[in-house]
Regions:
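Active-site neighborhoods of metal-dependent hydrolases
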Residues: 1-27, 93, 98-107, 111-137
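His/Asp/Glu-enriched, well-ordered alpha-helical/loop segment
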Residues: 1-66
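C-terminal cap of metal-dependent C-N hydrolases
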Residues: 40, 44, 60-101
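Short, charged low-complexity intrinsically disordered segments located at boundaries
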Residues: 52-54, 69-73, 111-114
Length: 137
């Protein structure tokens, strides 16, 4: 047989990773097999099973805490309450660091005043309304 891994083709993970996990279960895997595909199989494929993929002393502390039991309901993987990255614990809804050192997260670039605000320019010039061809005939 072959190992099945959860993963994308280069795009960032996100909600799609949960959907893919759920589809593995819908395709016939047990919840444990699907969770293994999302964790340990990928670590083994990368040759990093001694560093990542499961919870064990000495491994990197990157994990999520879920409100629910994905072994009973695989869709509980969506109910992330906390995330641990490199041993630092974060509150999932706020993304603030909690635990030993409480730190409020900084704003993302799209939350900054005026970021990505090209619309007034296009509204003034009406250039978003006109088809433009820069080719030479």
């Amino acid at each position: 047989g072959v190992n099945i891994n959860l993963g994308a083709h280069g795009q960032l993970q996100g909600l799609g990773a949960h959907w893919e996990l759920w589809m593995l279960e819908q395709g016939g895997m047990t919840n444990m097999q699907a969770l293994r595909a999302a964790t340990m199989n990928g670590a083994e494929y990368l040759g990093m099973e001694t560093e990542i993929g499961s919870i064990k002393e000495g491994k990197l502390a990157d994990l999520i805490i879920i409100d629910g039991n994905p072994l009973k309901n695989i869709q509980d993987t969506e109910n992330v309450t906390h995330t641990m990255i490199n041993g630092r614990l974060y509150d999932a809804p706020t993304m603030n660091e909690i635990g030993n050192k409480e730190t409020k997260r900084t704003k993302f670039f799209w939350e900054l005043e005026g970021s990505g605000n090209a619309y007034p320019f296009y509204q003034q010039t009406q250039s978003f309304m006109r088809p433009v061809c820069h080719c030479r005939m």
